[in-house]
């Protein structure tokens, strides 16, 4: 089903179901011989979803998830380290945008007094809360769920939940931007900047300028079509991931942040995976993804 500007979803459908795919990758990494991280809650979420009738992807889709598992693990590790480093500077307020099913508020070593705000669709956060409560999981920081769509007035919901914009904050934007229209992406970063005190940090998974080239998109679509045909031959249905994305020209994230007072550093997906000694496979080779870290050094009145 194609996306609309006001759609919503449960954990087992549309954008929500992608969180289960990422949880599969985290569960796989956690059980590997030399994991970059351990997320003992990933399998808990998968089991809870299965109890609701969800079935893990098999065939071509399952193969795709396994193929990008090293990328997903590297991404998780980068954001984990980003939060921990922010805590090392004394930042004790974190906001996870589109938090999905990653249990960072439960599994990371937060400094004393840290408040972690998680923003996502109401049904996603309810599933997460119910599952973790049933598992008797206790957060490692003060956890505050903020159930609101990021295309709505989430800043008001965040402040109403206790967020203090006068304190430095560490923000994460992971696995989110392609699910937002271009204008919504700009608005997201405008709001983050407005809510950030100087010294705040932001970590972003972004696409480079090469992602939206005709050449790359054509290669990607061909690969997806091949996988969907393989799934059909096996009698399985593989949804088209592009139906969930807004594929349109948008601002280059590092440039946008620098233009609005953020000091920025970047690393490509390939270089990040090399850092963690993870192989770049045919499914991840040439993936034009950037991991962007920013520090707000010039708070402006805009």
Predicted regions located by residue number:
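Rossmann-like AdoMet
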Residues: 1-146, 165
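Rossmann-like AdoMet/SAM-dependent catalytic core
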Residues: 2-5, 214-302
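Cys-based phosphatases of the PTP/DUSP/CDC25 superfamily and their flanking regulatory architecture
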Residues: 18, 155, 168-169, 181, ...
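A short, conserved alpha-helix within the catalytic core of class I
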Residues: 145, 153-156, 179-197
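Short, catalytically relevant binding-site loops at active-site mouths
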Residues: 151-152, 177-179, 208-212
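Short amphipathic alpha-helix with an adjacent loop that forms part of the alpha/beta core around
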Residues: 155-165
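A short SAM/SAH-binding and catalytic strip from SAM-dependent methyltransferases
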Residues: 163-184
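Conserved beta-strand signature within the Rossmann-like core of class I S-adenosyl-L-methionine
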Residues: 170, 189, 194-210
């Amino acid at each position: 089903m194609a996306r609309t500007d006001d759609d919503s979803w449960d954990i087992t459908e549309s954008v929500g179901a992608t969180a289960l795919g990422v949880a599969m990758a985290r569960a796989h990494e956690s059980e590997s011989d030399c994991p970059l991280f351990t997320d003992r809650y990933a399998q808990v979420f998968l089991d809870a979803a299965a109890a609701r009738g969800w079935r893990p992807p098999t065939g071509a889709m399952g193969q795709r998830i396994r193929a990008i598992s090293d990328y997903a693990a590297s991404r998780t590790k980068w954001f984990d380290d980003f939060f921990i480093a922010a805590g090392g500077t004394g930042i004790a307020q974190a906001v996870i945008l589109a938090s999905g099913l990653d249990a960072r508020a439960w599994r990371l070593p937060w400094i004393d007094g840290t408040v972690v705000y998680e923003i996502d669709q109401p049904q996603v956060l309810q599933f997460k809360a119910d599952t973790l409560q049933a598992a008797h999981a206790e957060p490692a920081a003060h956890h505050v769920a903020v159930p609101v769509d990021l295309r709505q007035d989430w800043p008001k919901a965040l402040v109403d939940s206790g967020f203090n914009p006068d304190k430095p904050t560490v923000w994460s934007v992971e696995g989110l931007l392609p699910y937002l229209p271009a204008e919504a992406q700009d608005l997201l970063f405008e709001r983050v900047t407005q809510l950030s005190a100087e010294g705040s940090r932001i970590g972003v998974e972004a696409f480079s300028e090469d992602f939206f080239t005709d050449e790359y998109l054509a290669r990607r679509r061909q690969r997806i079509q091949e996988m969907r045909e393989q799934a059909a031959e096996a009698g399985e249905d593989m949804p088209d991931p592009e139906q969930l994305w807004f594929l349109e020209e948008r601002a280059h994230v590092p440039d946008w942040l620098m233009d609005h007072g953020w000091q920025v550093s970047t690393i490509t997906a390939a270089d990040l995976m090399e850092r963690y000694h993870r192989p770049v496979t045919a499914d991840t080779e040439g993936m034009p993804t950037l991991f962007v870290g920013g520090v707000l050094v010039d708070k402006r009145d805009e």
